[in-house]
Regions:
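Positively charged, small/polar-rich N-terminal and surface patches that mediate targeting and assembly
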Residues: 1-152
Length: 152
């Protein structure tokens, strides 16, 4: 059995850094705390600048076989790493189960990220529906809430 983080992560993938920035700005205007936001994307100077400007620190470099080198930061990254710190080995598709997503969701998020998408997540159970609405409204493709049991 897979251990699942009891907090809720709402995840969406934006087509590029420009769209991700718009979505993140909207999340912040909606009152979602910067420390609840995570960003995972293919390594680039543009992604590094987005992470640093949004989260106030540099992204961690993680290399997976499915995506190549990524830059990542935020509470989702810690949850995906797990106690074994095996995100690099298992990739997004193998670790998103830890935060309540099905394997096929993990493969979709991994594929979109490998194609240059910017994965943005929010860790906030009470505001999961709000985060989902913002992600959808600002172009966060395949936005979903991991193992969410509430109602929209």
């Amino acid at each position: 059995m897979v251990d699942v983080d009891t907090g809720r992560f709402t995840v969406g993938v934006f087509q590029d850094v420009k769209w991700a920035q718009k979505g993140i700005d909207a999340l912040r205007r909606a009152g979602l705390a910067p420390e609840s936001i995570s960003i995972i994307a293919k390594e680039s100077a543009e992604v590094g600048a987005l992470i640093e400007a949004t989260l106030g620190a540099q992204g961690e470099r993680i290399e997976t076989s499915a995506t190549g080198p990524l830059l990542a930061r935020g509470p989702l990254v810690a949850a995906l790493q797990g106690p074994a710190r095996d995100l690099a080995k298992l990739g997004l598709s193998g670790t998103l189960r830890r935060v309540g997503f099905q394997a096929h969701d993990g493969r979709i998020f991994e594929t979109l990220t490998a194609r240059g998408g910017v994965l943005v997540s929010v860790h906030s159970e009470p505001r999961a529906a709000d985060a989902l609405a913002v992600l959808h409204s600002y172009g966060g493709g395949n936005a979903a809430i991991g193992a969410w049991t509430g109602r929209v």
